[in-house]
Amino acid sequence: MAKEYSTISRIYGPLMIVEGVKGVAYGEVVEIETEWGEKRKGQVLDARENLAIVQVFEGTRDLDIKTTRVRFTGETLKVPVSMDMLGRIFNGIGKPIDGGPEIIPEDRRDVHGAPLNPVARAYPRDFIQTGISAIDGMNTLVRGQKLPIFSGSGLPHNKLAAQIARQAKVLGEEESFAVVFAAMGITYEEANFFKKSFEETGAIERAVLFLNLADDPAIERIITPRMALTVAEYLAFDYDMHVLVILTDMTNYCEALREISAAREEVPGRRGYPGYMYTDLATIYERAGRVRGKKGSITQMPILTMPDDDITHPIPDLTGYITEGQIVLSRDLHRRGIYPPIDVLPSLSRLMKDGIGKGRTREDHPQLAQQLYAAYAEGRSLRDLVAVVGEEALSETDKKYLEFADRFEREFVAQGYDEDRSIEETLDLGWELLAILPETELKRVKKEMIMKYHPKYRGRSS
């Protein structure tokens, strides 16, 4: 039952303290009305004996302690869901901003989702093609996985996110694939880039966009990824769709978490972030996966910018504990004009082995990826040696490794923003590059694979 109070004792930042309340619960939705009739929404952050701390989504600017009324609805925050959300753009709290009509909901779902019994989870399997060789070939994305992208300020992670959202597909099941894209704390320029990218390429038809701008209240950023994941769960488990959820930028999310924690005067943890940030991030990342008996799946690609390119910073550090690998963008590759600047050596997809190989991508994929990785690592190591002793000191084989490393970056890692490579094109390109090396150096690939896929022998009858 709804209860109304006008006993606000304090307003600071996005928070207000309401005293003399009874029967108020954590997470309860609050309706706030000013003396001139303006209505805002909020949520209970903390409920104690006779007071409640409320976070106001639209901010507390111009709210008067004496005349503002607060109504506790007794309900949790819910998002209206419908298949009509595909092709639409919303703000951070689910209101349409594309000029289209309001969504007529088929249902209303709690933004925090329902706890998923670990026993009910199915193991992530099957390949998702992003059309980007450095990911598909070397750090494969698997259906149901959570694979973050670790970027840095000024690197083209937004461009990469838009390309993945446009190109990603489940092979043979394109009609059941959708993208839910949530951007947090982005500028108007970035928001316009995403809108334009989705609309001009037609990717908007199979996508749902949530855009939280930098000048929107910080508290809204806490809700945005949960809104997106609630819609993703609806599409995946009610309509058996394979949903890719892209969240950018999780660093902005964590900054909002720190800002609200400071406003609540909580004891800070590492670098001022709240001590519960690991648990909070887990409530987002752990909503990826597959459920036994359900055809649909949720795959997550959170994107975060590492402050000062520091991979040990609390945000990437804690993210790495929860997720299943990472795609690392390199400032050095970016400076040399290579897009996407994915550094395959520190990058890792822990579930890659379960989504590739015969019947999923191609039988040679696991061995080819290992050989490419080993050869590129050797080439990178020799680059450092050349800087000390010069190229004249290298053997002919060493020079081949140097050539391989250079061409691997220019031809395999680098590709156009509009270039969508199939997995077959990616793997064949890998073999073309391995042909630079003597066959005796291909120690991680079985002889029968060399005879079948190496350019020297390809096309010959067995």
UniProtKB/Swiss-Prot annotation:
One of its GO terms (cellular component) is proton-transporting two-sector ATPase complex, catalytic domain. Its main location: membrane. SUPFAM superfamilies: C-terminal domain of alpha and beta subunits of F1 ATP synthase (SSF47917), P-loop containing nucleoside triphosphate hydrolases (SSF52540). The keyword Translocase does not apply. Keywords: ATP synthesis, Cell membrane, Hydrogen ion transport, Ion transport, Membrane, Transport. The keyword Cell membrane applies. It is a peripheral membrane protein. InterPro entries: ATP-synt_VA_C, ATPase_a/bsu_AS, ATPase_A1-cplx_bsu, ATPase_F1/V1/A1_a/bsu_N, ATPase_F1/V1/A1_a/bsu_nucl-bd, P-loop_NTPase, V-ATPase_su_B/beta. GO terms for biological process: proton motive force-driven plasma membrane ATP synthesis. GO terms for molecular function: ATP binding; proton-transporting ATP synthase activity, rotational mechanism. Gene3D superfamilies: 3.40.50.12240. It is found in: Cell membrane. It comes from the Archaea. Component of the A-type ATP synthase that produces ATP from ADP in the presence of a proton gradient across the membrane. The B chain is a regulatory subunit. Belongs to the ATPase alpha/beta chains family. Has multiple subunits with at least A(3), B(3), C, D, E, F, H, I and proteolipid K(x). NCBIfam families: ATP_syn_B_arch, PRK04196.1. This is A-type ATP synthase subunit B. The gene is atpB.
